[in-house]
């Protein structure tokens, strides 16, 4: 039965490729910036923007975006709760003197979809019973944290994303010398990678393979000067995670697409989380990365303020046409938000330089 419910390879590939489409320029810095700018107009959240792109903004079928299937949209619906319901924090006041000088944590968006896509989500969930829909859209709060339920395809995509985040991002960080042999091991042990834990991993591997390499040896090889050895170790970590993925049944849901979920078996789930913590500690939260994220936050906010101040002057012709057709101020702000959210880092930087930086930008330079 389970094999019949698993998504077609093309479908799950499409879900994986599509799930981050809504991320704005400069990653979380851009997301915080747009949520700050849109706090009085419905907010902003990257995953919610993905749903908006797929069903409205992408130019394939007028008014329906890429016109994807219901199951694909269910697969990318990570947080089935509207912004207005998920946002419990009181809005912080705007800072008109220096609008870009904000603390990221004050304007971090809730996990949600945008209110503009309520009808889309209603259509996505239409095949499910009222009870299933109610449980999915009203996730419980456990230990002060909202616990979201996922559909089967979403759980597979999330699992793949987590494995990539912890292993392939580690590979990139090692290549860039952001993570070294010297700083990796203290951070890994602090995250829970003790000798006893590594021994537990080895016991699991030994029970499955006649010939095996200890997990500590695999991790040490990540720092080999030989790139082939490093690649082989990365491949081994990915393989260990993949072969320990399982499907479990959540009895609170009736429909199998909601009741069945993919998960990573212990202790490999802990290993994945430990590697993820290393990346967060040594890379994501490092001052060098945070400096760039803050700079991106400033670029996005100042672009938004310039575009909303004089949209006819600064918006591209097609975008301005959409802007003037918007039914109210809230919808007009959303047009500006959509335009900026669709930029790459490079495009946003070039547009910023053209508008704000003397001696930079030219009418002959294409964006």
Pin down the residues of each PLM region.
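Sequence-structural signature of the catalytic-core scaffold of metal-dependent phosphohydrolases
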Residues: 1-14, 21-227, 238
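Non-catalytic regulatory/linker segments of enzymes
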Residues: 7-10, 293, 321, 355-367
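A residue-level signal for conserved active-site and pocket-lining positions in enzyme catalytic cores
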Residues: 50, 300, 340
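Charged/polar positions within long, soluble alpha-helices
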Residues: 88, 165-168, 172, 243, ...
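Composition- and surface-driven signal marking solvent-exposed, interaction-prone regions
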Residues: 169-182, 253-254, 317, 352-356, ...
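C-terminal subdomains that position terminal phosphate/3'-OH groups for nucleotidyl transfer/ligation
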Residues: 196-331, 343
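C-terminal structured interaction module
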Residues: 314, 335-367
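Hydrophobic (often cysteine-bearing) scaffold residues that line and stabilize catalytic clefts
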Residues: 26, 30, 46, 156, ...
């Amino acid at each position: 039965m389970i094999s019949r419910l698993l998504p077609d390879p093309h479908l799950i590939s499409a879900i994986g490729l599509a799930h981050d489409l809504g991320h704005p320029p400069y990653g979380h810095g851009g997301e915080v910036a747009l949520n700050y700018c849109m706090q009085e107009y419905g907010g902003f959240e990257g995953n919610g923007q993905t749903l908006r792109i797929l069903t409205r903004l992408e130019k394939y079928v007028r008014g329906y975006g890429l016109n994807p299937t219901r199951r694909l949209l269910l697969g990318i619906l990570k947080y089935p709760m509207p912004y207005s319901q998920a946002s419990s924090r009181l809005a912080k006041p705007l800072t008109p003197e220096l609008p870009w000088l904000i603390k990221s944590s004050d304007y971090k968006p809730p996990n949600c979809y945008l209110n503009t896509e309520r009808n889309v989500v209603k259509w996505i969930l239409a095949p499910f019973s009222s009870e299933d829909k109610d449980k999915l859209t009203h996730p419980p709060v456990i230990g002060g944290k909202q616990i979201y339920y996922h559909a089967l395809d979403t759980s597979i995509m999330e699992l793949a994303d987590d494995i990539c985040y912890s292993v392939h991002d580690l590979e990139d960080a090692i290549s860039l010398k952001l993570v070294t042999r010297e700083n990796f091991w203290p951070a890994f042990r602090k995250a829970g990678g003790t000798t006893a834990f590594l021994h537990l991993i080895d016991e699991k591997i030994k029970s499955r393979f006649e010939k095996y390499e200890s997990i500590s040896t695999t991790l040490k090889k990540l720092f080999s000067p030989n790139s082939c050895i490093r690649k082989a170790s990365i491949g081994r970590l990915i393989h260990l995670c993949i072969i320990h993925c399982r499907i479990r049944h959540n009895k609170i849901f009736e429909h199998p697409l909601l009741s069945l979920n993919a998960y990573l078996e212990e202790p490999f789930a802990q290993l994945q989380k430990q590697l993820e913590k290393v990346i967060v500690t040594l890379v994501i939260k490092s001052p060098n990365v945070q400096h760039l994220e803050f700079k991106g936050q400033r670029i996005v906010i100042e672009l938004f303020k310039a575009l909303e101040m004089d949209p006819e002057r600064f918006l591209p012709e097609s975008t301005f046409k959409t802007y003037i057709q918007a039914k109210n101020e809230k919808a007009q702000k959303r047009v500006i938000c959509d335009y900026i959210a669709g930029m790459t880092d490079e495009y946003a930087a070039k547009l910023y330089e053209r508008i704000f930086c003397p001696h930079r930008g030219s009418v002959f330079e294409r964006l």
